[in-house]
From Swiss-Prot:
Annotated (6S)-5,6,7,8-tetrahydrofolate binding sites: 114-117
Name of the protein: Methionyl-tRNA formyltransferase
Gene: fmt
Pfam families in the cross-refs: Formyl_trans_C, Formyl_trans_N
Keywords recorded for this protein, A-Z: Protein biosynthesis, Transferase
GO CC annotations on file: cytosol
Catalyzed reactions per annotation: L-methionyl-tRNA(fMet) + (6R)-10-formyltetrahydrofolate = N-formyl-L-methionyl-tRNA(fMet) + (6S)-5,6,7,8-tetrahydrofolate + H(+)
Disulphide bridges: none
EC number: 2.1.2.9
Lineage: Bacteria, Pseudomonadati, Pseudomonadota, Gammaproteobacteria, Moraxellales
SUPFAM superfamilies tied to this protein: FMT C-terminal domain-like (SSF50486), Formyltransferase (SSF53328)
Length: 320
């Protein structure tokens, strides 16, 4: 089949790489415009664009597809002229109007990083960890105009462990998404079968995964240790949990575990011990967490042993 692929980050590039190994023809790739990145703020192509260029696939980077503007209408017409059988969309980042969704012969299929209708929206991986879900997965759906509202065609399941961060879970789901889309697109007959058997989402089970904002990542010591640990794992690798030491300095916290230490009448935010495991801090409900990897402003991330050697933190200190 002739496939258009639309996606931007590494999650999408993993799926594109898998599709490139099939007998299908990737006739075009759509991805977001190049962005400034790194210390030099150089314009950098997305992971999907980089992969497409390596395989000599034409790349399109429209700003939008709004038919109310000349450039949006031109982008729609350009896509239609490609004559695709199906369009695969994964973390593309642009809204696709109904006219675009209807253009390919079999419409547009989306690779979504949750078990829909739970965690529709921008941050399904992070919200699943922060909420304490013990399972997530991938949903392949036929796209509709609403936000992740399309009919479901295929699901895979992935347990969430107590060690998973958004980084590790992202990689697991990216691999599952790649496998899932290849299964759905094994042949034209297979695709027709999954389209015929697709399932409407139960709106009563909908939960939204709202976009992350940096302020959420500030550690709130009044929460119990289990929730603090979930948040630290959910916000790794972005925006990274932090302790606001003073107006200008934040201590980033990359990893943690539930502490085996305790202290009666400890104040929330109080450091009760520093040892080879890490920095043990009191949280709400008389629970305790152990910070195992932290990063001071301008420095590198330190492990538990290195934290103790810096002597920048001390037992009895109250973290804000």
């Amino acid at each position: 089949m002739k496939i258009i692929f639309a996606g931007t980050p590494e999650f999408a590039a993993t799926a594109l790489a898998a599709l490139l190994k099939t007998s299908h023809e990737i006739i075009a790739v759509y991805t977001q415009p190049d962005r400034k990145a790194g210390r030099g703020q150089k314009l950098t192509p997305s992971p999907v664009k980089q992969l497409a260029l390596e395989h000599n696939i034409p790349v399109y980077q429209p700003l939008h597809f709004k038919a109310s503007t000349e450039e949006g209408l031109a982008a729609q017409q350009e896509l239609a002229a490609l004559g695709a059988d199906v369009m695969v969309v994964a973390a593309y980042g642009l809204i696709l109007p109904q006219a675009v969704l209807d253009t390919p012969k079999y419409g547009c299929l989306n690779i979504h990083g949750s078990l829909l209708p739970r965690w529709r929206g921008a941050a399904p991986i992070q919200r699943a960890i922060a909420t304490g879900d013990d399972e997530t997965g991938i949903t392949i759906m036929q796209m509709a105009a609403g936000l992740d509202t399309g009919d479901m065609m295929y699901k895979t399941y992935c347990p969430i462990t107590s060690e998973d961060t958004s980084a590790t879970l992202h990689d697991k789901l990216a691999a599952q998404g790649a496998t899932a889309i290849c299964a759905v697109l094994e042949s034209e007959e297979t695709l027709q079968k999954y389209l015929a058997e697709r399932e409407v989402q139960d709106e009563s089970l909908t939960v939204y995964a709202h976009k992350l904002v940096k302020s959420e990542a500030r550690i709130d010591w009044s929460m119990n240790a289990v929730q603090v640990d979930r948040n630290i794992r959910a916000f790794n690798p972005w925006p990274v949990a932090f302790i606001q030491l003073d107006e200008n300095n934040a201590l980033r916290v990359w990893n943690s575990t539930i502490s085996n230490q305790n202290k009666a009448d400890a104040q929330a935010g109080e450091i009760i011990a520093i040892d080879k495991q890490g920095v043990h801090v009191a949280c709400g409900e008389n629970t305790f967490i152990c910070l195992t990897s932290v990063q001071w402003p301008g420095g590198k991330a330190l492990n538990a042993q290195q934290i103790a050697q810096t002597q920048k933190l001390h037992v009895g200190q109250i973290l804000p």
